[in-house]
Amino acid sequence: SLRNYCVNAVAQTAIKFVYCTCGMLNQYTKNTLTFERNKATSFMELNDSRTATVYGVGKIGKRVYELLEANGLKVKAVDLRAKELDKLYNHTVNFVSKEEGIKDTDIVVNVMNLTRIKESPLYNVGYFSKEYLLQATRPIEFINVTRGDIAPESGLLELYKEGKILGIGTDVFTDETAFSEALNGRGEFNTPDLKAAKEIMDKALDRSENFYVQPHQGFNSDRAAVEKAKDAIIHVCEWYKNGGKKFDEQLPYYTLK
């Protein structure tokens, strides 16, 4: 498929954020300034006493699941398509309900595709609401590598300040167009989520909190760039083969006028 080029890259980005948040990378890096070794907070060791929950187990989510298992964690997964995916993955994924997913977990990784259609059973704007995350039975690390709209920043920041979230790693933001424009002086941080996103970004950059951010670049590996270039050439060839009217596989985020 023409959409497979970045599966491993995005999955590895999720694991990078897991290591940063669990390892409290900002604090440990800043401690080097004075070579402080006595007052550091203990980091979260990844082992089989810790549980991670993966939300959304398509190709990328499945790879995230595998990498978390390879790091010694207990892993569970939440996906509305669990029945069909369980068969597809030969019963190798521990699927649980949405309610079970948040309980007794230490690390939450969002890998769901965004569905904005309210009538769809897959609708997930605001899925990780403050109310849902408060059902966690212990403080969690929160990782998001697909779409910011699924996990509004204002709720994440509030829960972090309340000690319910221990660290945030995100490659995505709720309104990336407005956020980018505001960051570049062409707009205002005029919503709770934009203000929270700015605070998370600022504190990630000055290393004052356990926050780690990227500007939607989780797919940007060296290998993925090569694979995407190959896919682009194949796509162009298909276009001309079909008389400039269609591709063999129409990607959902491209529309033909």
Where are these regions (language model features)?
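Phosphate/diphosphate ligand-binding glycine-rich loop within oxidoreductases
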Residues: 1-32, 44-45, 142
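Mid-domain beta-loop-alpha active-site segment that forms a flexible
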Residues: 5-13, 59, 65, 220-236
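Short, charged, surface-exposed secondary-structure boundary motifs
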Residues: 8-12, 85-89, 177-181, 223-224
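Oxidoreductase and adenylate-handling cofactor-binding alpha/beta cores
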Residues: 11-27, 70-71, 230-243
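Short gly/ser/thr-rich secondary-structure transition/capping motifs
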Residues: 32-38, 87-95, 122-125, 150, ...
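Rossmann-like dinucleotide/phosphate-binding beta-alpha-beta segment
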Residues: 42-138
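Rossmann-like dinucleotide-binding domain for NAD(H)/NADP(H)
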Residues: 139, 146-257
